A protein has these predicted regions:
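A short glycine-rich, Lys/Arg-flanked "PGG" loop and its adjoining helix->strand segment in the class I
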Residues: 179-191
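A short acidic, Gly/Pro-enriched loop at the edge of an enzyme's catalytic core
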Residues: 154-165
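Conserved class I S-adenosyl-L-methionine
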Residues: 35, 40-97, 110, 114, ...
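Core SAM-dependent methyltransferase catalytic element
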Residues: 253, 270-288
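C-terminal alpha-helical "lid/dimerization" subdomain adjacent to the S-adenosyl-L-methionine
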Residues: 55, 72, 200-270
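Conserved beta-strand signature within the Rossmann-like core of class I S-adenosyl-L-methionine
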Residues: 193-200
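A short SAM/SAH-binding and catalytic strip from SAM-dependent methyltransferases
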Residues: 165-178
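Class I SAM-dependent methyltransferase SAM/SAH-binding core
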Residues: 102-104, 108-155
């Protein structure tokens, strides 16, 4: 009986020790989990700044502005100039008269300069101040009459029915609220006015580009490519099926006609050079 009691007491003490160790271990584990969660949240906030998407996007393009401007200057002196000029002219109505054209997300002013040289009144806007400076300098060097200003593509300061045409190239994929942007673009063009939106899902494919391919992004640093990929992950538009989504949205918004041209990429970028876009480009064309 004494032996049994002793063993029971021994076991109880063992249980108390186990319980105490287990309790301390669980507290320690909880603290470690909490710290790990805080660390992961810090990393996520740093790389996926959901609270201020536009600031992050603007910072990315600001850091790319100088090299981007240099590449656009070269493109304006390359065979791509004629290809893009012919492409734009094939869609522009009343080409014999001067039209009021808004270049959305104009970057270094590539479309603005081309359309201005065709005799149209063109204003380019971009949310990134450094890009607008590049556009102004490039336009001045080419004696272009195109004008530029810093403005948000989702919140235009122009009156309703101001423009005949809105053009955009490689813009919509990195807009936090593309539905608001489309609504604004439709608002500022006159009835019967035209939207020409050239776009592609650039960020989705940054990690999948063959190393041997000669393309427009091959000299972009890995750090900038990662930031570009972050933009893709933090924006809702990246999960949309495009350009079908664009068609459905513009139709719901009251566009009288919406069409898609998926052959623009192969036509403009038929060969791999420093301007080559290795992801499928498409045109969303809408009439108000």
């Amino acid at each position: 009986m004494y032996y049994i009691t002793l063993n029971i007491n021994y076991l109880w003490r063992k249980c108390d020790i186990y319980s105490m160790v287990h309790s301390h271990f669980m507290v320690l584990l909880s603290v470690l989990k909490m710290r790990r969660t805080e660390k992961m949240n810090d990393i996520f906030e740093k790389n996926h700044p959901m609270k201020d998407d536009k600031k992050f996007i603007t910072s990315y393009w600001s850091d790319r502005a100088r090299d981007f401007g240099s590449l656009r200057a070269k493109e304006l002196e390359s065979p791509k100039l004629k290809l893009w000029r012919d492409e734009l002219m094939s869609h522009i109505f009343d080409s014999d008269r001067s039209l009021r054209i808004l270049d959305i997300g104009c970057g270094a002013g590539f479309f603005s300069i081309i359309l201005s040289e065709l005799g149209h009144t063109v204003h380019g806007i971009d949310i990134t101040p450094n890009m607008i400076e590049e556009a102004k300098q490039l336009a001045q060097s080419l004696d272009s009459d195109a004008t530029f200003s810093v403005m948000d593509a989702e919140n235009l300061s122009f009156d309703t029915n101001t423009f005949d045409i809105v053009v955009a190239r490689n813009v919509t994929w990195n807009l936090p609220h593309p539905d608001k942007a489309y609504a604004e673009w439709l608002r500022v063009i006159r009835p019967g006015g035209l939207i020409l939106n050239y776009d592609a899902e650039h960020a989705r494919n940054h990690h999948n580009l063959p190393q041997s391919v000669h393309h427009a992004h091959e000299h972009v640093s890995n750090e900038l490519k990662e930031r570009c990929h972050t933009i893709y992950h933090m924006l809702d538009i990246s999960s949309f099926t495009r350009p079908q989504w664009d068609i459905e949205l513009l139709t719901k918004m009251g566009a009288s006609s919406v069409s898609i041209d998926s052959t623009v990429g192969p036509r403009i970028y038929a060969e791999e050079d420093e301007f080559y876009i290795p992801v499928p480009m498409f045109l969303v064309k809408a009439i108000k």
